[in-house]
Amino acid sequence: MHELNTALKAFDKDTSIGAMVLTGSHKAFAAGADIKEMSTKDFADAYGEDFIESWSELPNTIKKPVISAVNGHALGGGCELAMMCDILYCHEKANFGQPEIKLGVIPGAGGSQRLTRAIGKSKAMDIILTGRNFSGRDAFDWGLAAKVFETPEQTVDGALETAETIASYSRLAVKAGKEVVNKSQDQGIREGVEYERRVFHSLFGSEDQKIGMQAFAEKKKPEWKHR
């Protein structure tokens, strides 16, 4: 996970990049944490070293949109990693799950929190307490995935197409859009609407707001300056 965080932070700082796609192989999206490594830890080890805290860096520090393109297995930490991304696309036969209960523990990298927010308490409770897996089609039907695809290739291509679309817009507006949607998860509707309005107003201080609205009025394609 350290290597992934390092790469994402570098891409986040690269001004030529507007959005990112995170994917694995056709067989598996991500393997999750090392169970053999975990099996030797006690409470002092896990708590003292903030075990798997690094898994929280992606949603907390990356400002550009990240799209997960999930094929194959996404279990445990792999499922949590997919849910950390801003948009989740998946193959209809992708295999999701939080099987930690079978190991005598629970999800530790946000699985219980993000899954509950996405699909509701009852379904999340069922999945986490039974350790049952669910398919990519289920993920889409339940609202966890934004899109579902018939083949692994279509999954990756679809994610790349969306990333290219996002990258074609003003970096400032995209960053603001991600910020306000994420903020909606942390506060009530009244506070969220007020926060959104403040961020909306702030964009009127950008060059891109002038460029975008003038281009619309003149029926031209905007040439963003990203400032």
Language-model segment annotations:
Residues 54-61, 69, 75-129, 142, ...:
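CoA-thioester-processing core
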Residues 32, 52-53, 76, 133, ...:
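Glycine-rich phosphate-binding loop at the start of an alpha helix
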Residues 2, 6-9, 13-16, 23-61, ...:
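Glycine- (often His-adjacent) and acidic-residue-rich active-site loop
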